[in-house]
Each structure stands twice: as structure tokens, then as C-alpha cells.
Amino acid sequence: MKITIAQAPQYIEQEVTIGAWLSNKRSSGKIAFLQLRDGTGFMQGIVVKSDVSEDVFSTSKNITQESSLYVTGKIVEDTRSDFGYEMQVSNVEVIHEANDYPITPKEHGTEFLMDHRHLWLRSKKQHAVMKIRNEIIRSTYEYFNKEGFVKVDPPILTGSSAEGTTELFHTKYFDEEAYLSQSGQLYMEAAAMALGKVFSFGPTFRAEKSKTRRHLIEFWMIEPEMAFVEHEESLQIQENYVSHIVQSVLTNCKLELSVLDRDLSKLEKIKAPFPRISYDEAIDMLKEKGFDDIEWGEDFGAPHETAIAESYDMPVFITNYPKDIKAFYMKPHPDRSDVVLCADLIAPEGYGEIIGGSQRIDDLELMEQRYEEHGLTGPAYQWYLELRKYGSVPHSGFGLGLERTVAWLSGVEHVRETIPFPRLLNRLYP
């Protein structure tokens, strides 16, 4: 019977066949230890010389790293391994022999590994990170489906920028200028006026010449928009959502977190509600910590976010940023015209902002004023203005950056390890 490594616990003391690649091996005179992987997991196969034919043992000792195999044997429990099971091998059939595999068990530099990203993905650590990424995506759909949201797919090619910035990738759209989307938010607001509560999940693009460990040129975002939802209710949805994905990863990715040596105690305490501080309070906190490079009215950089997060062992909301450093569509605070009803969610352990969100302007006259202030004219933005003409309602939304969230939950240092094929300032291949 052919099974996967993940199915092995269901077949204890049974003889099965697994299609796998040889990730590593070691051998003595009488025993060969095969480290097998098949995409669903990793498992050790033990080949004992006295229990198999001469040909099988010779093959097991000489097969090269990353060769593909059919391995047959009996599944037994192995309490010493993280997986908990191993195979007592009776036969090895080589499908394809790999020669001179470039990523050997020794240490390699980052640039070398990035040049071979298509192969680096096969490693145990990268496999674990991708499985955690997958669990975050799975639990995202689970949460929003359970809460009555409708999945909507906004366009990737747009005629405008959601943020009103210049950090856009331009492309020709027949006889017109088009851009790769920075955010699906404007379209999601339109969808919310039709469907109530919606969310999208897709790639976004920022032409930022940034080389920090938190930035990618192409990254994926989860972007919910909600009609009849005001700022505080949106914050509650955000913290419940983040709590849900963290607990899902803890429940369903125990082995992967162990492979990554992640400190589980730091994740186990991530449960709503999250602390909230205002932008004003954050500025005061930074001053008390000795920061003299930030003044009221300026946005926070990575060192500032890290310093603020150090005061908490949970994600923390920073609310009510100055109007002038936030996007044109954010609703002013009812008691202060200089700040808006928005929040950034800062992850602990130095992982920075993982969510940005706000209540959106729902008043036509105020939005027209914002258009004028930001120089937003023409058909690219006219349709968005019309959302305030026909049955406008209070509404809010937010965007969660998937890769930063993966980095935080898996504990990896750089976001380049959180997406299969990262697009960086100096890297378009592989």
C-alpha cells in the first residue's frame, strides 16, 4: 500500500510504500539511516544489512542526496524523534538519482541559498515555515467564513493607488497607464456596500527601495472591509482574528514549531483583548525611553515600533495617528480634527506592524475635500467617490501582511523566508 509520511501513524506495524526524496543519510558497516521527505513530512528509514538483500543495502549506502525513491517497509513507533515514527526498510527502489546537489548539510551563506531558493525550499526549516504559512491562510478562511464574511477578489491591475503614493509599478494597459495593485481596499469598500462583510486575499506590490528584514516588493495581504462597523468594533474583530490564527498554528503546527525551536510560551499568551495606546502615548513612551529622533506628527520607524512592543508581551494597538501621515480615506476623530480613527497592530518580539486599519470616511462632502487636498482627480477615483453618494454608511477595514505574520509566528529573522519565492530589491529570480 502506498501512503504519505503524514499518514504513517495510521499504519503502525504494517508494511507500506512511500514515495520520497533522500534529504540526508548516514551509515555504518551494518546499518544505513535514510532521512526521507515527501512534502507531507520527514521520517527516518532504518536499513539493517542482515534484514535486506545485498542490492538493497548497497543502494541504501550509496544513494545520493535528493535522489527520489520508493521506500518499502514497516512503520514502527520511535519516541526519540520529533515525528514519533520511523520505517524499518525492506526495499529501496531508485526513481531518479540526483548528482551534485548544491545544498549540502554544511552551512551556506544567505545569497547562495537565495540563488538556490527553488532547492532551499526542500530543507526541514523552510518546509516548516511554509506549513505555518499554509495554516495561517487556512485559519484565515476558517475565521472569516465563520463570521459571515464573503470572499471577494479585487483586481491586480488598477488605474489608481489606494494609498495615493508614488511607490507604484507602472505598466501599459493598451493605450492607458495602469499599476500593479498596492491594496485592494478601495474595491473592497465597494464590495462591502453590496455584500456587507467581505475579505480578500492576494498579492500586493510596493516599488519601495527598501532592504529591511521586514520588507518585500511583492507580498500577500488579507484585507477585510465591513459595512456598519465602526472603529472600536473593527479593533475587536482584528484582535479576535489574530488570536484565532495564533491558536490555530499552536494547535495544528506543533511539529513545525518544534523544528523551528519556537518559544511556545510567547505564543500561548496571545489571546484577545490586546492592549491599546494612543499615538500621543506612544510618543511619550519613546521620549521616556530616550528617543530624540521622533516628534509628534512623524511616523514610526522599525526601531520605534520595536521599542514600543518591548513594553508588552502581546500585540499592541497604536491608535489615532496624525491625519497628515495617514491615507486620505481615514475618518477624522470626532473630538480632534488633527488625528484619525485608525490603528496599527504591532507584533511583539520586534516583528513590527502586522495590521493597519481605520474607519473610512463616509461623508461625501468631507471626501470631496480630501480629494481636493490630495489632488485626486479623473475617472480613476470618481467611482470611489460615488460610494458616498448612494446610501453611505459607517464602515471600517484593515489589512494584515501575511509574510510579517508568518515571520512572527515561526520566529524567523527575515521575511524572505516566509514566502516561497521572495521578490526583493535586488532579486527577481528564481
Curated annotation (Swiss-Prot):
Belongs to the class-II aminoacyl-tRNA synthetase family. The gene is asnS. It comes from Oceanobacillus iheyensis (strain DSM 14371 / CIP 107618 / JCM 11309 / KCTC 3954 / HTE831). NCBIfam families: asnS (TIGR00457), PRK03932.1 (NF003037), PRK05159.1 (NF003483). The keyword Heme does not apply. Homodimer. InterPro entries: Aa-tRNA-synt_II, aa-tRNA-synth_II, aa-tRNA-synth_II/BPL/LPL, Asn-tRNA-ligase, Asp/Asn-tRNA-synth_IIb, NA-bd_OB-fold, NA-bd_OB_tRNA. Its main location: cytoplasm. Its EC number is 6.1.1.22. It is found in: Cytoplasm. It catalyses: tRNA(Asn) + L-asparagine + ATP = L-asparaginyl-tRNA(Asn) + AMP + diphosphate + H(+). One of its GO terms (cellular component) is cytoplasm. Transmembrane segments: none annotated. HAMAP family: Asn_tRNA_synth (MF_00534). It is an enzyme of class 6 (ligase). Keywords: Aminoacyl-tRNA synthetase, ATP-binding, Cytoplasm, Ligase, Nucleotide-binding, Protein biosynthesis. It comes from the Bacteria. Pfam families: tRNA-synt_2, tRNA_anti-codon. One of its GO terms (biological process) is asparaginyl-tRNA aminoacylation. One of its GO terms (molecular function) is ATP binding. This is Asparagine--tRNA ligase.
